[in-house]
């Protein structure tokens, strides 16, 4: 087998016909500036070809189900293995997908509970065991010799009625005696039963004495009793004690039944086991009392009930006042001071009690009727479900939230599944074990109390569960729970989960391609991740990791630096070799940072801010432990802490949503907290994330930043356009008029090839320009609109230097380091880091009030150290204008430049959720309890 992968003539995206050799069975890191061509080499060339070759080996019939793989633009690749890509984009947003289902641990847990679980009655009647006739007979024969007993068949358990037909059937079947409510009667002398009382009726099948040779008769009698009572039998020992047996998993006392234990019973994705109320989602759309009564200090007359306050008619306020008068509830008392009984009446109605309602509308219509008071919550529910009006449904939805399902308490499963426990009655059910953190889950699984027989059955299942939990633990995910929805995971978390799954598969000879697995990982956990990557390598796999993390680069066997710049200025191999060899390469920007020749400097002084702050008091969402956090305004703030310490909960779930609720009247409810102060000091909240700036190729930097509007205005003002009567819309490729209709302004045409990949060719009519020939005859400075869209931002800044409105917007794109991007480049081809900087550029050219609050969650994702240096300069401009910038970040180069740090921890999950230290980087570095401080110390002193 070849000892290296050899690529000849790679030209995907901006790659410049490069040749590169990659050693096999090594940990190879591909690095370079954002947009330099790293992903084009790793994913769009290597992975695409590896996957395509595998699919090509399948039959034409199988290929039609897998979709067609496009051949990457490369001359040849030798020594390629089957490729598996682990990137950040494939997280399932399906609410049924959880950490447990993604890692397949749920499958093993379901098997464990089906094989060694014991059901317990949900009404507290103890263990429910299913017994065969043979087992029941053996149990009865353990009773002392000469013991007298009755064998009873319980046909009625706690049911109201006279049950005459039951007694008649017993008599017809030839039985002589029945026991009714504890008294034995001749079947012909049973007294008339009360219709309104609950009764128990047992058929006396046999009366016997335990002695030698009785087994055969006992067997027949028990079998008959089980048949009559549909699987139940009572052994009455005639001395006030009874033995209850069942052929099924059913409680003999209350009749609670559990079907046969099999894995599907424990799946919330199958109707057999899922909660019928929420269909296995664990959450339901319910009316949220906090949204119905947003300000409990108001009285009913002042409008405490939001849905019935600002309304087009007075119908509901009238109804409320008349009902409250009848039911004796004060209209002028603050809602919070009303009794629980009164609050329940207002929210949930009068439980059938009626009042007289008189109402006259503005058109003279009169309503005079005796009706029960419905209650505001029931009213919202009814109108939401019954209305045909989209407007009404939207209005009612404002007062609803996804709340934990009250039937299954969020466990997603039905009572039958949740009645089964492992490790005795005090052991966990499958919902409880899934709610434990990975670390606690590991401890519990190692300490389960099982019988000798159960231990033998469970051993192989527990091994698989432990192995997978250990892998998750080793990649820094010890704080996650198996019940956590996959859609709530960050890109880094979901990637490390799939990484753990791959480690568990123990494959060898595979080419793994990873995209920044260190995202969202604290420096403390980085070593464990690198150890996991090395373990995969040692199994005989080749790992190609697109990464900017300095520690990962230094630990790599081989380092490839793509560059030297980004976009058209990149696409070449600048350096390749061991990390030490790359560090000595003077042409490599990466090498200069590795050798210490280039550094991001520590600011000489920290900003003091404007003296104001926003304060969140008593935050208690997820793992936050009644945290109070103060965010000083006019500063660059970094929120830090190990993975799972509560950073995202504090910022994204509470601070961001609380500010948005106040400033933007956003209905998205923040997490639990007591109060928040200081929002009046900011006038705008801007969340700048790495999501795409557009979902279709029609969206591009020019349209996103708004500069295309100005450019179209400029073209419409040229003499040629005026003579022809062309308006601004003529120069849009999205509407009829100026665009090429053959390709609808796309510039390309898709040709379906069925069993071969779809082919995209330039439109034959417009030759890829997007516009018709008449539109292209209009020029500004000898360039038509299509040629302008093909310009890089750098070229366009010069081209439009005498048009300040356009030049200013383009300059901001250049300032954030995106000068290499073309104005018409499809938004779908921009990386996450590029999209984020495009959003920053769009913000930069807006007039600043100095009271904006910017939030960025891990802005360094996908950014090289050189890109980070540029990003920090842009963020500094926002702060220098008086605004506040807050970043959630693990990157020490960013943290060391902050004015103020809020460090959460000390651990992730239940071990986190408190603020360890706040202050300047120097103050945090001096704190012994802070993991961030420990690593920061080296950075500050090193500089």
From Swiss-Prot:
Give the binding site residues for ATP: 32-39, 641-648
Primary localization: cytoplasm
| Zinc finger region(s), C4-type | 251-278, 740-766
Q: Which UniProt keywords apply?
A: ATP-binding, Cytoplasm, DNA damage, DNA excision, DNA repair, DNA-binding, Excision nuclease, Metal-binding, Nucleotide-binding, Repeat, SOS response, Zinc, Zinc-finger
Q: Which GO terms describe its biological process?
A: nucleotide-excision repair; SOS response
List, for all copies, the residue spans of the domain called ABC transporter. 308-589, 609-937
Q: Name one GO molecular function term.
A: excinuclease ABC activity
Location comes to: Cytoplasm
Superkingdom is Bacteria
Entry-linked SMART domains: AAA
Q: Name one GO cellular component term.
A: cytoplasm
**Any idea what job this protein has?**
The UvrABC repair system catalyzes the recognition and processing of DNA lesions. UvrA is an ATPase and a DNA-binding protein. A damage recognition complex composed of 2 UvrA and 2 UvrB subunits scans DNA for abnormalities. When the presence of a lesion has been verified by UvrB, the UvrA molecules dissociate.
Q: Which family does it belong to?
A: Belongs to the ABC transporter superfamily. UvrA family.
Q: How does it assemble?
A: Forms a heterotetramer with UvrB during the search for lesions.
Name of the protein in its database record:
UvrABC system protein A
Recorded source organism is Streptococcus pneumoniae serotype 4 (strain ATCC BAA-334 / TIGR4)
Provide the gene name from the record.
Answer: uvrA
């Amino acid at each position: 087998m070849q000892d290296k992968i050899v690529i000849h003539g790679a030209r995907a995206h901006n790659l410049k016909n490069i040749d590169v050799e990659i050693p096999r069975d090594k940990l190879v890191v591909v690095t370079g500036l954002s947009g330099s061509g790293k992903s084009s080499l790793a994913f769009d060339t290597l992975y695409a070809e590896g996957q395509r070759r595998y699919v090509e080996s399948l039959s034409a019939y199988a290929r039609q189900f897998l979709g067609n793989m496009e051949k990457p633009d490369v001359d040849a690749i030798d020594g390629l293995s089957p490729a598996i890509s682990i990137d950040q984009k494939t997280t399932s947003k399906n609410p049924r997908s959880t950490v447990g289902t993604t890692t397949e641990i749920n499958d093993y847990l379901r098997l464990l509970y089906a094989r060694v679980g014991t059901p317990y009655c949900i009404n507290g009647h103890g263990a429910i065991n299913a017994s065969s006739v043979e087992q029941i007979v053996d149990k009865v024969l353990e009773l002392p010799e000469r013991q007298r007993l009755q064998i009873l068949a319980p046909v009625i358990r706690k049911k109201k009625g006279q049950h005459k037909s039951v007694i008649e059937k017993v008599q017809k079947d030839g039985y002589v005696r029945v026991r009714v409510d504890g008294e034995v009667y001749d079947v012909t002398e049973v007294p008339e039963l009360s219709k309104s009382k609950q009764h128990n009726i047992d058929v006396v099948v046999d009366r016997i004495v335990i002695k030698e040779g009785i087994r055969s008769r006992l067997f027949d009698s028990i079998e008959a009793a089980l048949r009559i009572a549909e699987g139940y039998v009572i052994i009455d020992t005639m001395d006030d004690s009874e033995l209850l047996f069942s052929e099924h998993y059913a409680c003999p006392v209350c009749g609670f039944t559990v079907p046969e234990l099999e894995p599907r019973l424990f799946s919330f994705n199958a109707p057999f086991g899922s909660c019928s109320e929420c269909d296995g989602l664990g959450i339901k759309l319910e009316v949220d009392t906090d949204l119905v009564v947003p300000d409990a200090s108001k009285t009913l007359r002042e409008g405490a009930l939001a849905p019935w306050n600002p309304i087009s008619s007075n119908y509901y306020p009238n109804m409320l006042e008349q009902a409250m008068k009848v039911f004796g509830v004060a209209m002028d008392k603050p809602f919070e001071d009303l009794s629980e009984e009164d609050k329940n009446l207002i929210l949930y109605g009068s439980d059938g009690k009626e009042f007289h309602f008189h109402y006259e509308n503005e058109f003279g219509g009169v309503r005079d009727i005796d009706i029960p008071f419905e209650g505001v919550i029931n009213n919202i529910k009814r109108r939401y479900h019954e209305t045909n009006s989209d407007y009404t449904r939207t209005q009612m939805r404002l007062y609803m939230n996804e709340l934990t399902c009250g039937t299954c308490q969020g466990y997603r499963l039905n009572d039958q599944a949740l009645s089964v426990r492992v490790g005795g009655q005090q052991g966990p059910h499958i919902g409880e074990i899934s709610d434990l953190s990975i670390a606690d889950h590991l401890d519990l699984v190692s300490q389960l109390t099982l019988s000798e027989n159960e231990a033998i059955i469970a051993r192989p299942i527990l091994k698989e569960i432990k192995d997978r939990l250990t892998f998750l633990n080793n990649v820094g995910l010890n704080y996650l729970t198996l019940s956590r929805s996959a859609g709530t995971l960050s890109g880094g978390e979901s990637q490390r989960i799939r990484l753990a799954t791959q480690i568990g598969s123990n494959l060898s000879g595979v080419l793994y391609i990873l995209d920044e697995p260190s995202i969202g990982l604290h420096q403390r956990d980085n070593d464990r991740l690198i150890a996991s990557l090395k373990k995969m390598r040692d199994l005989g796999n080749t790992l190609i990791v697109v990464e900017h993390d300095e520690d990962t680069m230094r630990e790599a066997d081989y380092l490839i630096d793509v560059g030297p710049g980004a976009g058209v200025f990149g696409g070449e191999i600048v350096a390749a070799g061991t990390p030490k060899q790359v560090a000595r390469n003077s042409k490599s920007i990466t090498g200069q940072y590795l050798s210490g020749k280039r550094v991001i400097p520590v600011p000489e002084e920290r900003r003091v801010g404007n003296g104001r702050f926003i304060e969140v008091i008593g935050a208690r969402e997820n793992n936050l432990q009644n945290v109070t956090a103060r965010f000083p305004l006019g500063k660059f703030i970094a929120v830090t802490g190990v993975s799972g310490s509560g950073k995202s909960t504090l910022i994204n779930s509470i601070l961001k949503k609380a500010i948005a609720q106040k400033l933007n009247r956003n209905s998205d409810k923040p997490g639990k907290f007591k109060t928040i102060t200081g929002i009046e000091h900011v006038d705008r909240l801007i969340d700048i994330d790495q999501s795409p700036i557009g979902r279709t190729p029609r969206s591009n930097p020019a349209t996103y930043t708004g500069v295309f509007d100005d450019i179209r205005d400029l073209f419409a003002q040229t003499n040629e356009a005026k003579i022809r009567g062309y308006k601004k819309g003529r120069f849009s490729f999205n509407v009829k008029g100026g665009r090429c209709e053959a390709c609808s302004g796309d510039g390309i045409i898709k040709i379906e090839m069925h069993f071969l990949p779809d082919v995209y060719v330039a439109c034959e009519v417009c030759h890829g320009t997007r516009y018709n020939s008449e539109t292209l005859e209009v020029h500004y400075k000898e360039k038509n609109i299509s040629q302008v869209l093909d310009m890089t931002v750098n070229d366009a800044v010069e081209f439009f230097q005498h048009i300040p409105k356009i030049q200013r917007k383009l300059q901001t794109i250049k300032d954030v380091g995106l000068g290499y991007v073309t104005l018409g480049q499809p938004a779908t081809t921009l990386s996450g880091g590029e999209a984020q900087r495009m959003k920053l550029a769009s913000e930069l050219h807006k007039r600043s009030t100095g009271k904006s609050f910017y939030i960025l969650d891990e802005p360094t994702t996908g950014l090289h150290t050189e890109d980070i240096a540029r990003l920090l300069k842009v963020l500094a401009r926002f702060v220098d204008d008086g605004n506040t910038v807050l970043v959630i970040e693990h990157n020490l180069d960013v943290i060391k430049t902050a004015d103020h740090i809020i460090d959460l921890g000390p651990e992730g999950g239940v071990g986190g959720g408190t603020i360890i230290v706040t202050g300047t980087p120097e103050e945090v570095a001096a704190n012994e309890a802070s993991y961030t401080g420990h690593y920061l110390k080296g950075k500050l002193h090193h500089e």
